[in-house]
Amino acid sequence: MTIEYLKKAEKTAASGEDDTRKIVAEMLSAIEVGGEDKAREYAEKLDNYTGNIVVTPEEIVAAGAKVPQRVKDDIQFAYDRVRGFAEKQRQALIDFEVELSPGLFAGQKQIPVATAGCYVPGGRYSHVASAVMSVATAKAAGVDHVIACSPPKPGAGVNPAIIYTANL
């Protein structure tokens, strides 16, 4: 059976790649030096966002109130399936040690990390499914501290459904 491409993107010449890398490197360096204040400055400049960077418990509750119940039900349905599968996956992985030759040991041991950072695409196109998949999987893995980060919609902040999902 041969593969037939139904759609295929035309190759285009790379443009601006070096400029982009330079700008990003400069921004990261500025944030490293300027910390949260510099990050806030970029959020205002690039996203027209001046709100909190870390959401408060009150903002989490307010975001949940903005999400329609049907959407919450759908998110919970997906979350339960993803977490259930991840828990089964974790159970299928076993710790072991084997002596391959006298004095030569090999093995594996699962140790959850203390903190996981979950990037959730947002802004123009919010991806709630990314929050479901990354947060549920991290929690199923036994991570104690799960942090979700998502870019704000210009002038509006993070999508309420993403905030709701990250808090499950």
For each feature predicted by the language model, list its residue ranges.
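N-terminal Rossmann-like NAD(P)+-binding subdomain of aldehyde/semialdehyde dehydrogenases
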Residues: 1-114
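Conserved small-residue-rich beta-alpha loop and adjacent elements
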Residues: 98-164
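Conserved protein kinase catalytic domain
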Residues: 43, 163-166
